[in-house]
């Protein structure tokens, strides 16, 4: 099929733009496909009509389809005209072309199983410039410089840009795209850009530049809840002055305008504050102001409030009873308030019980009461407490008036103490202990004579003991596990996610404790696999006293999150199990993870610097740690996961020195958009949070990049604490002031430059994890090239049978100047290694290869030697 110019057909008006294609099908004069003419490129002005045609020969009734950029043309007039029995013309009409009509056109027809297509026509639509970028509205401080951008395209090109400030031209001509630099404005101003080409001009939307200002005063300040020592405050912020509010100050005083007022600065939002350590029963007044980057607002109105008082703190003392002919007189000492906040005392409350029946409490003024409505023939139990408007104080010790007591006065309980119950209790305990000891002794003697008792039976070849199966059961039946999951009270969605990773408790054995935290612990375990072998794993479990279903669900959600991961540098879930407990208590959930021999990266870095046996980590090893973490985070970000808690402490170090990103307790999956906003209070790692997370509780992949920069700093400093000496509450102001973590000693400029890019105030200016991984791999490759150019490092390890005077094997290292040592100083990691062999270690891997080292069976690598080889790159190391 080919396109050619058409001179028109009878009955058709001349075409503004046309092409003709011929297709010779089987049965025509020419067999097969015959192309005529050449491809056509056509240019028309916007709004003009266009007609295209193609001819088909050798087919009686062809079904002609017009295509544009690979898609069937729908919204256009299409006509097929018969010229002869086997010749047809296909017409495509566009009444008024727009820019969207530009593209590559051709026609096609189906001949049996084969589709014939014509040569194509490239249609170009020219018109006035079209804006792809228009200047945007801005809010800026007074006299602060800013930029506006404008971009327009043709065809036809070139496109020239002119800038207008109101009705005044302030820039141009300039080629598109164009940026207007404005030194500053002092009032609301409109800007626009004008794009011109040979077809005409177009004007952009006006961009309104407004002036930022300090915010307006807050209003509707309310004290929402009040207790004796605390008060919660909420307020509505005033107009923000077109700048983000970053903090509010709550000023508290005993009286409005008092000089010694307490000021509490809180980050916002939310616009609430909890005031602590207030005095009970005290009058206070408070007011609030908020601040943005241009300064604070005026204070709002003073709001008075009073904290609640305290209930009495002491129980009445010397509570006693006196029998009389008319009744029972009760007396006690007056309760004197210990704290001024307790307030004035009200009546005393008298409680009395007779024959297991509790009577109504009596309200008594003063410290004396006469009880007449009681039965002297029955035992009586009495208590008394002080009360005030806030509540009741503690009750006194119970006073028992016996029906057999005919004394004229019932004194305080301590004056009638009886030693009989005490003596009986001690005797009972001694007798019980003696009986238990006797039983255990007799049982032990029977066990030691077990062999003698069954000698005759064993000699006859008969079994000494016969067993009968009481019942049969299956330990791994899913019904039991399902019932246990149901008892946890977790959501059906979470339960469904965990069903295929549940492991029966009987399939693994818990071992030693690896670590313990505030909410749980991690223990070593042996997991039995399907082939009967055992593999070492780590088991993470909640504390036994955490019984809330919400805590259990949050714990198991981390496991469900890890289930989706499959990457060498992201911790992978092995399974989930439930530890049964007696007496109907909730089972303890356990998350089973791969065993990481070297623990978390932060602890490993600390041990290399300040451990009992410090060792040096070469720069290549530190950069390799960063590459591994970047690989893992690149994988997570590609799956729309944000970690929210990336730090060295949450990265695990495997036996082969590869790093895995772990601890997904705070991670979230993003289902729409590219951000997650924290909606409830959680414990968050402030010193690893990005600016937008601190200010707006906003978390994206860009905030994870910020945390990765802090993690890089941790690695380069070998586990130091970031922002040492700066409190968490001061971090935001420290960062918003432009401050960042300083370059660590011995840190390469290229590495610190990457860190600094991660801490850009604009999240979109931070590099992606893919970019970070590639840059770090380049740095690592450069370090490897440098290290291979250095001399090999020789380490002579004496035989273990020849200890030094200190009693430990001696290590001799070949002497080199500091300029030659380079990063090969990592030999400190093998100080004091007992061995009877001689090894040559090369930081660059130029001496012996790993295979050569492994060919010495008489001198296997011990743990410290293996660690050094991994650091120097002489053993395999997984990569992403």
Curated annotation (Swiss-Prot):
Q: Which residues bind ATP?
A: 514-522, 540
The residues covered by the Protein kinase domain are 508-785
Query: What organism does the UniProt record list as the source?
Result: Mus musculus (Mouse)
Q: What is its EC number?
A: 2.7.10.1
Q: Could you tell me what this protein does?
A: Receptor tyrosine kinase that transduces signals from the extracellular matrix into the cytoplasm by binding to several ligands including TULP1 or GAS6. Regulates many physiological processes including cell survival, migration and differentiation. Ligand binding at the cell surface induces dimerization and autophosphorylation of TYRO3 on its intracellular domain that provides docking sites for downstream signaling molecules. Following activation by ligand, interacts with PIK3R1 and thereby enhances PI3-kinase activity.
Q: How does it assemble?
A: Monomer and homodimer. Interacts (via N-terminus) with extracellular ligands TULP1 and GAS6. Interacts with PIK3R1; this interaction increases PI3-kinase activity.
One Pfam family in the UniProt entry: PK_Tyr_Ser-Thr
Which tissues and organs express this gene's product? Abundant in the brain and lower levels in other tissues.
Q: Name one GO cellular component term.
A: plasma membrane
Q: Which reaction does it catalyse?
A: L-tyrosyl-[protein] + ATP = O-phospho-L-tyrosyl-[protein] + ADP + H(+)
> Disruption effect?
knockout mice are fertile, but male animals that lack all three receptors TYRO3, AXL and MERTK produce no mature sperm.
Q: Which residues lie on this side of the membrane: Cytoplasmic?
A: 441-880
Active-site residues annotated for this sequence: 645 (proton acceptor)
InterPro entries, A to Z: FN3_dom, FN3_sf, Ig-like_dom, Ig-like_dom_sf, Ig-like_fold, Ig_I-set, Ig_sub, Ig_sub2
PANTHER family, A to Z: TYROSINE-PROTEIN KINASE RECEPTOR (PTHR24416), TYROSINE-PROTEIN KINASE RECEPTOR TYRO3 (PTHR24416:SF279)
EC main class here is transferase
Positions where Phosphoserine occurs in the chain: 456, 808, 859
Q: How does it sit in the membrane?
A: Single-pass type I membrane protein
What Gene Ontology terms describe what this protein does at the molecular function level? ATP binding; phosphatidylinositol 3-kinase binding; protein tyrosine kinase activity; transmembrane receptor protein tyrosine kinase activity; virus receptor activity
Regions of compositional bias (Polar residues) in chain numbering? 849-864
> Domain Ig-like C2-type: where?
31-118, 129-209
Q: Where are the transmembrane segments?
A: 420-440
Indicate which residues are glycosylated according to the record.
Answer: 53, 75, 181, 220, 230, 283, 356, 370
Query: What Gene3D superfamilies does the database record attribute to this sequence?
Result: Immunoglobulins, Phosphorylase Kinase, domain 1, Transferase(Phosphotransferase) domain 1
Report the protein name in the record: Tyrosine-protein kinase receptor TYRO3
Q: Mind telling me which SMART domains this protein's record contains?
A: FN3 (SM00060), IG (SM00409), IGc2 (SM00408), TyrKc (SM00219)
């Amino acid at each position: 099929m080919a396109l050619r110019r058409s001179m028109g057909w009878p009955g058709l008006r001349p075409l503004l733009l046309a092409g003709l294609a011929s297709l010779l099908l089987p049965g025509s004069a020419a067999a097969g496909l015959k192309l005529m003419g050449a491809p056509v490129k056509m240019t028309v002005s916007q709004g003009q009509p266009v007609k295209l045609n193609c001819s088909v020969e050798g087919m009686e009734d062809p079904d002609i389809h017009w295509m544009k950029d690979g898609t069937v043309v729908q919204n256009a007039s299409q006509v097929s005209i018969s010229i002869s029995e086997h010749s047809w013309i296909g017409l495509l009409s566009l009444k008024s072309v727009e820019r969207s009509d530009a593209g590559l056109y051709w026609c096609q027809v189906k001949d049996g199983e084969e589709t014939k297509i014509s040569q194509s026509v490239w249609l170009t639509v020219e018109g006035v410039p079209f804006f792809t970028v228009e200047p945007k509205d801005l809010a800026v401080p007074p006299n602060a410089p800013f930029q506006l951008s404008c971009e327009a395209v043709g065809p036809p090109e070139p496109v020239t840009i002119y800038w207008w400030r109101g009705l005044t031209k302030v820039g141009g001509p300039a080629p598109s795209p164009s940026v207007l630099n404005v030194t500053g404005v002092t009032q609301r101003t409109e800007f626009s850009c004008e794009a011109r080409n040979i077809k005409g001009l177009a004007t952009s939307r006006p961009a309104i530049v407004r002036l930022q200002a300090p915010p307006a005063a807050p209003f509707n300040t309310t004290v929402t809840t009040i207790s004796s020592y605390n008060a919660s405050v909420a307020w509505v912020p005033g107009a923000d002055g077109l700048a983000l509010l970053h903090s509010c100050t709550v000023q508290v005083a005993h009286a409005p305008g008092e000089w010694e007022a307490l000021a509490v600065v809180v980050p916002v939002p939310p616009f609430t504050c909890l005031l602590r350590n207030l005095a009970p029963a005290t009058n206070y007044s408070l007011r609030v102001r908020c601040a943005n980057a241009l300064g604070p607002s005026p204070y709002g109105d003073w709001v008075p409030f009073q904290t609640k008082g305290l209930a009495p703190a002491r129980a009445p003392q010397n509570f006693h009873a006196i029998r009389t002919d008319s009744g029972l007189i009760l007396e006690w000492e007056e309760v004197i308030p210990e704290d001024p906040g307790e307030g004035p005392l009200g009546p005393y409350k008298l409680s009395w019980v007779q024959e297991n029946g509790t009577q109504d409490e009596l309200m008594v003024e003063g410290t004396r009461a006469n009880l007449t409505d009681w039965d002297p023939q029955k035992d009586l139990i009495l208590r008394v407490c002080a009360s005030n408007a806030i509540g009741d104080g503690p009750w006194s010790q119970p006073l028992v008036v016996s029906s057999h007591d005919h004394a004229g006065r019932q004194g305080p309980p301590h004056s009638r103490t009886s030693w009989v119950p005490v003596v009986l209790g001690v005797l009972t305990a001694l007798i019980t202990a003696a009986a238990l000891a006797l039983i255990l002794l007799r049982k032990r003697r029977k066990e030691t004579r077990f062999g003698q008792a069954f000698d005759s039976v064993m000699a006859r070849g008969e079994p000494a003991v016969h067993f009968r199966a009481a019942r049969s059961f299956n330990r791994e039946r899913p019904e039991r596990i399902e019932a246990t999951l149901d008892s946890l009270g977790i959501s059906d969605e979470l339960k469904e996610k965990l069903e295929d990773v549940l492991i029966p408790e009987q399939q693994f054995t818990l071992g030693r404790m690896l670590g313990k935290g505030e909410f749980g612990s991690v223990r070593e375990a042996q997991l039995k696999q399907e082939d009967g072998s055992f593999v070492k794993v780590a088991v993470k479990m909640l504390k036994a006293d955490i019984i809330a279903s919400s805590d259990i669900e949050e714990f198991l959600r981390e496991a469900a999150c890890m289930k989706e991961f499959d990457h060498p540098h992201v911790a992978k879930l092995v399974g989930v199990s439930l530890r049964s407990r007696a007496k109907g208590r909730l089972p303890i959930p356990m998350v089973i993870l791969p065993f990481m021999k070297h623990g978390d990266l932060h602890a490993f870095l600390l041990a290399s610097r300040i451990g009992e046996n410090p060792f040096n980590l070469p720069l290549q090893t530190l950069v390799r740690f960063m590459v591994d973490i970047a690989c893992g985070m690149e994988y997570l970000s590609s799956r729309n996961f944000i970690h929210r808690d990336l730090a060295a402490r949450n990265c695990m170090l495997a036996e082969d020195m590869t790093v895995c990103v772990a601890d997904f307790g705070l991670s979230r999956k993003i289902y729409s958009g590219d951000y997650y906003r924290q909606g409830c209070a959680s414990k968050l790692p402030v010193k690893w949070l990005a600016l937008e997370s601190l200010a707006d509780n906003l978390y994206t992949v860009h905030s994870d990049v910020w945390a990765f920069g802090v993690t890089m700093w941790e690695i380069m400093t070998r586990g130091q604490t970031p922002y040492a000496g700066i409190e968490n509450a001061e971090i935001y102001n420290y960062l918003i002031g432009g401050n960042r973590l300083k370059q660590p000693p011995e840190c390469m400029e290229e590495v610190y430059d990457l860190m600094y890019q991660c801490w850009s105030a604009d999240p979109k200016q931070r590099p992606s994890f893919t970019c970070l991984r590639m840059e770090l791999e380049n740095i690592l490759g450069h370090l490897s090239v440098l290290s291979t150019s250095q001399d090999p490092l020789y380490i002579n390890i004496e035989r273990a049978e020849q200890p030094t005077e200190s009693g430990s094997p001696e290590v001799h290292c070949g002497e080199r100047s500091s300029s030659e040592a380079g990063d090969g100083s990592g030999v400190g990691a093998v100080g004091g290694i007992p061995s009877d062999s001689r090894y040559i270690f090369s930081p660059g891997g130029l001496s012996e290869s790993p295979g050569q080292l492994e060919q010495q069976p008489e001198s296997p690598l011990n743990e410290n030697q293996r660690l050094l080889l991994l650091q120097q790159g002489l053993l395999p190391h997984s990569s992403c």
